[in-house]
């Protein structure tokens, strides 16, 4: 579809890092939030990957995503424990060094009482060379940004706070608009017409979502475009096709 190739589109990839996500022990709550957040400010989330706490896998994913999209966001793996290896992996992906950052250390020293900035906690101040810090208003330990990669915590409340901190710095594109058409018929009855409408309106993205309503198969059709006039024409065509199919 051509809509996701528009020159004014700002794109993003999201990398979720953590064995606990892949094992099912922790249920991810960040993907949906980030998708909603980015859509609202005019950034298209185009790809999500989930990788384990394995340096080679993180490096591979980061390098693939950062070369493909305007922005990359990561969550997870920047805490104080031995398996929090995201910062080191990002440094390796960019080919830079990593050490305790004086700015990050000062933040942690101001946050923890005297004598409580343990070596484990100090790990959270290790930042790749050349990176900027991302403010953490919840628990203070910062995330960081290096080039187009934004590295954030996995805890949802902290990730959301970090996202709020970086949002003003992000370039945004024209927002994707949407209009919904409900069809009181199964998806198969409208599939061919939707394909024809999609071909007629290449600037749109048309998705159909089958549902069950009061024991009947129904379909919700969502038409998306950055151009409101084109979106409305395509949605009107969908509504006409639905009425015709219902009348058959």
Model regions and ranges:
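An accessory alpha-helical subdomain
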Residues: 148-241
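Glycine-rich phosphate/diphosphate-binding loop of Rossmann-like nucleotide-binding domains
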Residues: 4-48, 52-53, 229-233
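N-terminal small/polar loop signature for handling phosphorylated ligands or for N-terminal nucleophile
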Residues: 32-85, 90-92
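Proline/glycine-rich low-complexity loops and linkers
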Residues: 57-63, 84-173
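Conserved short beta-strand edge segments in small beta-sheet-based binding/regulatory domains
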Residues: 241-248
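Short beta->alpha linker loops
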Residues: 50-53, 103, 122, 185
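Glycine-rich beta-strand-to-loop/alpha-helix junction loops that act as flexible
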Residues: 17-19, 74-82, 153-154, 225-226
């Amino acid at each position: 579809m051509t809509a996701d190739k528009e020159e004014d589109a700002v794109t993003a990839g999201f990398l979720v890092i953590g064995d606990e996500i892949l094992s099912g022990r922790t249920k991810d709550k960040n993907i949906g939030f980030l998708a909603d957040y980015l859509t609202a400010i005019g950034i298209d989330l185009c790809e999500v990957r989930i990788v384990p706490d394995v340096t080679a896998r993180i490096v591979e994913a980061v390098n693939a995503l950062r070369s493909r999209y305007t922005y990359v966001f990561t969550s997870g793996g920047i805490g104080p424990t031995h398996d929090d290896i995201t910062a080191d992996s990002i440094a390796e992906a960019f080919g830079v060094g990593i050490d305790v950052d004086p700015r990050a250390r000062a933040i942690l020293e101001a946050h923890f009482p005297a004598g409580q900035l343990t070596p484990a906690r100090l790990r959270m101040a290790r930042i790749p060379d050349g990176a900027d810090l991302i403010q953490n208003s919840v628990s203070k330990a910062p995330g960081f940004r290096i080039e187009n990669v934004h590295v954030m915590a996995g805890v949802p409340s902290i990730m959301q706070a970090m996202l709020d901190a970086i949002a003003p710095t992000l370039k945004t594109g024209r927002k994707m608009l949407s209009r919904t058409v409900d069809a009181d018929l199964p998806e198969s009855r409208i599939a061919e017409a939707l394909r024809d409408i999609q071909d007629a309106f290449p600037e749109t993205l048309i998705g159909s979502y089958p549902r069950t309503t009061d024991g009947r198969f129904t379909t919700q059709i969502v038409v998306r475009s950055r151009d409101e006039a084109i979106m409305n024409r395509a949605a009107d065509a969908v509504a006409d096709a639905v009425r015709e199919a219902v009348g058959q």
